[in-house]
Amino acid sequence: MEKEIKILVLIIGAGPAGLATSACLNRLNIPNIVVERDVCSASLWKRRSYDRLKLHLAKQFCQLPHMPFPSNTPTFVSKLGFINYLDEYATRFNVNPRYNRNVKSAYFKDGQWIVKVVNKTTALIEVYSAKFMVAATGENGEGVIPEIPGLVESFQGKYLHSSEYKNGEKFAGKDVLVVGCGNSGMEIAYDLSKCNANVSIVVRSQVHVLTRCIVRIGMSLLRFFPVKLVDRLCLLLAELRFRNTSRYGLVRPNNGPFLNKLITGRSATIDVGCVGEIKSGKIQVVTSIKRIEGKTVEFIDGNTKNVDSIVFATGYKSSVSKWLEVDDGDLFNENGMPKREFPDHWKGKNGLYSAGFGKQGLAGISRDARNIARDIDSLVCGRSSKNKLSK
């Protein structure tokens, strides 16, 4: 049985991007519905993140539109603090997602987006008809585990994606290999080490390592100075803090951290103590994995190591291509990412938008939400809402 539902704007995804977009539309009195496949909003934060997680950027760079963090909130907000903030945000702006909705298909027909959704609670098919559709599932739709010879068919230990990792308590005394040296990888490696696991970390590429304070200084200065000048200052501060990290297998890219982010989309890694553990020898840096047999991992440099568990902090991928049958909005590529780079990534044709795909973190989500709401408002009401949404 199918249930037909008509709405002006359909938002797919109830993470920060979906909540922010709905909130901006609600402030303009534009009808919208948010559908979410999970049982809660912000499920990546509530159900798929590790316990010690904090926002890696200062709070002023992470707040959503129209609701700054309270002045007594710590500069770097904890996981629980951010979850509470998101829940309060949804309540304040009357965002009420429909949970347990799994989008099966979406296509454009006769001036409307037709979106078929399975209500996992009732098993009914809901068919939404919307003039505008916002893909707000973001860049972190699904965890990625690379294909490694022997991993699936031979490995005798346990392997998991970083989204399944909570803390290192059950890994105490175990030999654990962390794959990936981004923020999740470095922080999980540090957490494991502090829980008395024997930790190695795979560093497959060049990486900038900075502190939260250095990043905060850099982001503040970018408002006034060229990116290359800010990069030089941040690298000087990083050199004073860490000295020569290449001695420990952490080689910096040729471009500075902020320029590298603009070019590659890859952020600097924020150190929470992992570099100190690496310098002391408590965490060993290793090269890329070549193959796995039993519990033995062979690396591309010929070295081997026996491990009990592997944690893959190897990132995420978009899930848009699974349900967007034909991109009649000319917005997404075959990998479910926008065809156009930031800042032109958020708007397609035929009323299709993307929120949270600009590789700009939470600050980018806020910009996307405001841009989308203003654009829809101008198309529906023929008015400028710039002032109303800039507060």
From Swiss-Prot:
Residues annotated as transmembrane: none
Pfam families on file: FMO-like
EC number: 1.14.13.168
Pathways per UniProt: Plant hormone metabolism; auxin biosynthesis
InterPro entries registered for this protein in UniProt: Auxin_biosynth/cation_transpt, FAD/NAD-bd_sf, Flavin_mOase-like
Molecular function terms, GO-annotated: flavin adenine dinucleotide binding; indole-3-pyruvate monooxygenase activity; N,N-dimethylaniline monooxygenase activity; NADP binding
Gene Ontology terms: biological process: auxin biosynthetic process; response to ethylene
Cofactor(s), by name: FAD
Domain of life: Eukaryota
Catalytic reactions on record: indole-3-pyruvate + NADPH + O2 + H(+) = (indol-3-yl)acetate + CO2 + NADP(+) + H2O
Protein keywords: Auxin biosynthesis, FAD, Flavoprotein, Monooxygenase, NADP, Oxidoreductase
Binding site for NADP(+): G180, C181, G182, N183, S184, G185
Inducing factors: Up-regulated by drought.
Binding site for FAD: G13, A14, G15, P16, A17, G18
Family: Belongs to the FMO family.
Record's function text: Involved in auxin biosynthesis.
Protein's name in the database: Probable indole-3-pyruvate monooxygenase YUCCA11
Organism: Arabidopsis thaliana (Mouse-ear cress)
Originating gene: YUC11
